Amino acid sequence: METLSQRITSMESVQLQGIAVAFVTASALYYVLPAAISHIQLSALPMLGKTEVVVIPPKLLSELSKSPRTLSAEIAGNEFIAGKYTKVKALTPILLHSITKYLIPSLGRNAVVMSEEVSNAVRLGIPTCNDWTGVNIYPKIMRMVTVSTGRFLVGSELNRSEDYIDTVHNYALDVSSAQSAVHKMHPWIRPLLAEWLPEIRRLRKRTEEAFALFESLIKERMKMQRELSESELPDDLLQWMIANRHNYNNEDAHDLVYSQLGLTFTANHSTASTITNALYTLATMGDLIDVIRDDITQALAESGGQFTSKALDSMWKFDSFIKETVRMNPLVMSVAVRKVVEPIKLPSGQVIPTGVTLETPLVAVNLDDQIFPNADVFDPMRFYNLREKDRKQGDAREAEFNQLISSSTSHMSWGFGKHTCPGRAFAAQQIKMILAHIILRYDIKLVGDSTDRYENIPKGHLSLPDPTKDILMKRREI
């Protein structure tokens, strides 16, 4: 299998007033050498569709986080998604509150419900495969994710509806197209012409369809909120948002729909891509499948066959494999993206002016041999071995840093600091459940005689699994 370092694209750098300035395309940044970051203080990168971007090494993140008023993740995110024109609201205050206060604490009591939803989605989504059968897996995974996520976002009234599945899926596609179209326009022209772009108008139409789809459900849920006791209410994100909307000035049903759509846009595709990346890797490593399957089976045996949160947490080898997959196949090129709203003076004396965007190249962290020895080699048991070592030494805190949902300057796939993905525990549980149900039911391998993992596709700031590829699947006798 080709290592990540072998896919690095060269870039031309020059020194300007003591700061390394690199002229690269957006996709080339994904392949920045770790050495290029670890040996310089800052790199200034002119990026397509953006003002100047300053790439900062991870060692500066903790220092910068001490002055939160000088940086804005919200402004940076809104610029990235062209929110002024797409109207995407990725993480509104009411959504953040509902996720952290209600969704994450509900994972334990709803784990079996999620497992049942996933089991049904896998059963309906994948062919019988009594013999080795080619399966275009990404679209099927995307549907499984949409349905199982939807159960906890909008409830059982909508999550399996074809109208809901189609709306959520196509909304994400339309947002991506609209975002790309806006960024291709010169910033000075956008206020005049962006609203007339075909991609923006198509997105508006899609959003109106979503409003129509959600309207009757939201009205019914508001009625339930007025008339039913708390124990009788649906246990999902929509109801929690309705219950708290007065505290966040979200009394308009449209605000609730925008929040729901923004969440599905950011969550569903990243979850589906992570699962697909894991399956593409597993298809090249037949011996590993048995190891992972045994880990899952042992944990389920200790939980009475139920996919409880405790059972999922005890699958250390499975967890390690997924975390290593995420490390070697990051979906985004950069993390900790912030807009400078007040000038920042660094310990070195350098000053970063207002208006600059800061970000840290994720691959530079993931391929740093000082953090991960033999960093460009895929080691599925890397984090399992580290956790076992920490456990034997009685260092429970350090062991936590080596599990899938951990976040630090060494583990940045979920983001960093107070803007670390608030729903990562939900996403991790869902990723494990979908993969586990597939691994327990099917053997998988690549099509033909190839042993090389399918290449991911660079797309702007993203690196995505190829959605057109098939894997061979065969039903196991259980």
From Swiss-Prot:
GO terms for molecular function: heme binding; iron ion binding; monooxygenase activity; oxidoreductase activity, acting on paired donors, with incorporation or reduction of molecular oxygen. Pathway: Mycotoxin biosynthesis. This is Cytochrome P450 monooxygenase ATR3. InterPro entries: Cyt_P450, Cyt_P450_CS, Cyt_P450_E_grp-IV, Cyt_P450_sf. Cytochrome P450 monooxygenase; part of the core atranone cluster (CAC) which products are predicted to catalyze most or all steps of mycotoxin atranone synthesis, starting from geranylgeranyl pyrophosphate (GGPP). The initial cyclization of GGPP to dolabellane is probably performed by the terpene cyclase ATR13. The Baeyer-Villiger oxidation near the end of the atranone synthesis, which converts atranones D and E to atranones F and G is predicted to be catalyzed by the monooxygenase ATR8. Of the CAC's other predicted gene products, the reducing PKS ATR6 might synthesize a polyketide chain. Belongs to the cytochrome P450 family. The gene is ATR3. One of its GO terms (cellular component) is membrane. Its cofactor is heme. It is a single-pass membrane protein. Signal peptide: none annotated. Keywords: Glycoprotein, Heme, Iron, Membrane, Metal-binding, Monooxygenase, Oxidoreductase, Transmembrane, Transmembrane helix. Its EC number is 1.-.-.-. It is found in: Membrane. The keyword Cytoplasm does not apply. PANTHER family: CYTOCHROME P450, P450, PUTATIVE (EUROFUNG)-RELATED. The lineage of its organism: Eukaryota, Fungi, Dikarya, Ascomycota, Pezizomycotina. It comes from the Eukaryota. GO terms for biological process: secondary metabolic process. The chain crosses the membrane at residues 20-42. Glycans are attached at residues 159, 268.
